[in-house]
């Protein structure tokens, strides 16, 4: 995290985000080594249904995906521990030569690589430390490639970011490549809010860890005691709005940005959004950026979807 955090790009993104209304921190601050560990703990929480629903789909559909793709290279964007990816690795084993897990956390990626190299000795595990929004064009060639973005990570992108990302994916795909994406669907608000405000407070610790990372890397003075956790449904944008809210008026300094921020009581600090999708709207959005949905699978409850996509002919 330290090398990434001191980079000009993240400093500029942080400066820009803190100048918006509401103030925002780039999501990448969540994923230092501690944050990555906390996120993996979140994926095991009973309230956080997303990985279980996605697992149900991949367990059932991975053989079909493998039959259609015959992929030689599997790329996973934001790989984490690649838990659900194992269904794809198993199904693609007859043709797969290389797995490229991409993640911003070098330490976490190293651990994942060691485990997968032992589990899949016939597949070259070729880790890539980076940000999938910026580094898509730097990924290894050698198709057919299946590029996967699982866990509804696509929902963490703001609409303009998401459009740019989908456009970049369409541009990166060769004729025999495909894009596989996990998508959380709109559902009961109480279930959504519970998923991001669990009883054990793990998600709150995950979000607060972003402040700790900013304090460490940017010599900032965020005081955890002056903020309360806030995760709520935004009906207008159809996303979960996740972050913190100032309990009292105070000033925060970010020495490495040469910045001071005045928070009024109740001012929000957004750390993440998690958009929820409807099929028709998602297909229109992707189609406008050059991607066609070839298959759309949901879990039995209709909570979650996995879409297999290809680039539309120019």
Feature locations, PLM:
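Substrate-binding/catalytic lobe of Class I Rossmann-like enzymes that use SAM or dcSAM, i.e.
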Residues: 191-275, 279, 283-289
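Conserved beta-strand signature within the Rossmann-like core of class I S-adenosyl-L-methionine
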Residues: 171-186
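A short, conserved alpha-helix within the catalytic core of class I
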Residues: 156-168
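Class I SAM-dependent methyltransferase SAM/SAH-binding core
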Residues: 89-134
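N-terminal auxiliary segments of SAM/dcSAM-dependent transferases
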Residues: 1-29, 36
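Glycine-rich SAM-binding Motif I of class I
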Residues: 82-86
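Conserved class I S-adenosyl-L-methionine
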Residues: 71-80
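Class I SAM-dependent methyltransferase Rossmann-like catalytic core
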Residues: 22-71
């Amino acid at each position: 995290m330290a090398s990434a955090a001191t980079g000009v790009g993240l400093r500029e993104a942080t400066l820009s985000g803190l100048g918006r209304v509401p103030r925002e921190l780039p999501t990448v601050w969540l994923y230092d080594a501690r944050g990555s560990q906390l996120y993996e703990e979140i994926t095991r929480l009973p309230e956080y249904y997303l990985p279980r629903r996605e697992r149900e789909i991949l367990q059932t559909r991975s053989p079909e995906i493998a039959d259609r793709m015959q992929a030689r290279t599997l790329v996973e964007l934001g790989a984490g521990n690649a838990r659900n990816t194992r269904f794809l690795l198993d199904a693609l084993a007859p043709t797969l030569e290389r797995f490229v897990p991409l993640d911003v956390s070098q330490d976490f990626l190293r651990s994942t690589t060691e485990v997968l190299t032992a589990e899949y000795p016939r597949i070259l595990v070729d880790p890539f430390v980076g940000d999938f929004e910026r580094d898509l064009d730097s990924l290894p060639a050698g198709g057919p490639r299946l590029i996967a973005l699982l866990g509804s990570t696509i929902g963490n992108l703001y609409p303009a970011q998401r459009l740019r990302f989908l456009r970049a994916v369409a541009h990166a795909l060769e004729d025999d490549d495909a894009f596989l994406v996990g998508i959380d669907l709109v559902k009961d608000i109480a279930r959504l809010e519970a998923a991001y405000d669990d009883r054990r407070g793990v998600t709150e610790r995950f979000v607060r860890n972003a402040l700790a990372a900013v304090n460490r890397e940017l010599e900032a003075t965020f005081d955890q005691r002056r903020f309360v956790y806030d995760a709520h449904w935004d009906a207008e944008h159809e996303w979960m709005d996740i972050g913190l809210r100032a309990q009292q008026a105070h000033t925060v300094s970010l020495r490495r940005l040469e910045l001071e921020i005045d928070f009024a009581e109740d001012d929000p600090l957004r750390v993440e959004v998690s958009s929820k999708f409807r099929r028709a709207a998602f297909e229109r959005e992707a189609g406008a950026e050059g991607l066609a949905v070839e298959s759309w699978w949901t879990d039995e409850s209709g909570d979650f979807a996995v879409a297999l996509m290809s680039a539309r002919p120019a």
